[in-house]
Amino acid sequence: MLTTLPEFFDKEHEDLLREFEGAQILREYRAAAWQNAVRMPFPGKKDEAWRRISLDALLSTPLEFFPDKKAHLPAGTGISAREAVFYAGTLATGLGINEARLEPALEQAGVIFRDYADVERGDPLLLADINGKVVPPADGKFAAAASALADRGVFLHIPARFRIEKPLLVRLAASNPGSAAFTHNIIKLEAGASAVVVLDFASDGAAKQTEKGLHAGILEIHLGEGADLTLVELQKFGPKLWNITHERAILERDARLHWVYGALGAALSKNFIETSLIGEGAEVKMHGFYFAGGEQVFDLDTQQNHLAARTTSDLLYKGAAAGSSKTVWEGMIYVDPQAMQTDGLQTNRNLVLSAGAEVSALPGLEILADDVRCSHGATIGKLDEDELFYLQTRGIPRVEAEQLIIEGFFGEITAQVPIAELQSEITEIIKARFELAVQR
């Protein structure tokens, strides 16, 4: 049955919540989250974090909630034979598929790499100590909805001092056209553990997709003392899907996180991406890229929280906007009074590729401690005519010259992806996005 979001949240849906299996503590968690979701108003123009975008189209569109899980799997969202060999573990989940593979040595070492719903049914106590601890349902209406209603996602737990040499791949099919989907993703590394994880969000993303859909998700990351995680997160949803996520990482003492985030798909994508350094010596690098075209809207809200002494954060996000698209980046570095000798850096660079595109960049600092080194900056500009002229004098047509400059602009970010084949895939997507922008 098709229902708008306001109509859906206007009902109790106790029967729906009862369908989720798991221990009593998890049922209580979902029930409490649902009450938060019902009680909270939908965000709007009066909310600072939401005032630059509109959810009117989303709220007025009828969607199907929890459609037939045997619905077709989007092309390209399964795991290829080549990927199965290259990665130490692969997980494809959503839309009727649940395929998990992990090298036997990792299983024997105690690594858990499974679908969130499977863990809830089979080993619910694994979730009890982290569910909602990193991203509380109170973070927002959509965070609460995902906490209450998620029926897919990844659960990764790596035991102390275990280092996974080969990367892990998660391919998450989030939503069929015309439907709403909710995901809950958890990555937990115990003290001294390390891993490289690729989190690939997909939908029925063919360019011909005509039906609208919604994905609301949360990502909870907890890194124990001295843990080391490289996370490559790619959002490649279809062109008619709304994507809203709340994502946060907590770092204990001397933990390290390198988080590469890429936004390329969706009609509208609103993402809260936050790191909290709660242990001395914790360090985070945040690299991001986004390329909007057509009428796409990207709104990225990043937060670097320094909550302990001698912590380091370094953020570099780059974006481009073509057609009549709109991009918003808003960043904040927060330094707690106890976070002495903090080193925080925040940089945002943007290219405006057409007269109809709209770009906003809003860096921010809130420093409550002395003896810190923090800086922030943002730029919005067009392609450099001198660079274009130089390339054209070398016999390169203007369109090709523009493409080369854009590839170089994003290259600083894509080079941070530690997997060569994935770098090439991202570069090809950026090329295709530019070619589409030129055609329009």
State each model region's role.
Residues 1-144, 316, 322:
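N-terminal amphipathic, basic helical "cap/leader" segment at the start of enzyme domains
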Residues 98, 104-396, 410, 414-440:
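Conserved beta-strand/loop scaffold segments within soluble protein domains that form the structured core
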